[in-house]
Amino acid sequence: MDTIKLSIVTPNGEIFNDDVKTVTLPGKEGEFGVLPGHSSLVSSLTVGVIVIEKVDSTEAVAINWGHVKVDEKSVDVLADGAIALTAGKDSEIAKNIEAAKELVNSVKDSNISVAAVEAKINSFA
């Protein structure tokens, strides 16, 4: 099965580093998906949820903003702030979801629909 290498890094360290089937990113101009063999690009990311589809599971990471570099074999995300929504025990996930909502609300960009991002975060609860 074809996969692509995804890494998500913040100033505090690495959040995710693994092979994935697909990844959906919150681009500045709208969400976009990346599959193995994708054309090379660099894009700004806005507040939202990165949805990671692995071979056997789906994970999610909330970010406040960042940048992504995509090529045929890898996706490298540099985010200012990121919180894994689906890793750990149920109590840790609940804490992470609350922390993700705080991260989203810290963004003061009027072009962002905070309610839409919070709804997506809640879908992983």
Swiss-Prot record:
GO terms for molecular function: ATP binding; proton-transporting ATP synthase activity, rotational mechanism. GO terms for cellular component: plasma membrane; proton-transporting ATP synthase complex. Keywords: ATP synthesis, Cell inner membrane, Cell membrane, CF(1), Hydrogen ion transport, Ion transport, Membrane, Transport. It is found in: Cell inner membrane. SUPFAM superfamilies: Epsilon subunit of F1F0-ATP synthase N-terminal domain. Signal peptide: none annotated. It is a peripheral membrane protein. It comes from the Bacteria. Pfam families: ATP-synt_DE_N (PF02823). InterPro entries: ATP_synth_F1_dsu/esu, ATP_synth_F1_dsu/esu_N, ATPsynth_dsu/esu_N. F-type ATPases have 2 components, CF(1) - the catalytic core - and CF(0) - the membrane proton channel. CF(1) has five subunits: alpha(3), beta(3), gamma(1), delta(1), epsilon(1). CF(0) has three main subunits: a, b and c. Belongs to the ATPase epsilon chain family. Produces ATP from ADP in the presence of a proton gradient across the membrane. This is ATP synthase epsilon chain.
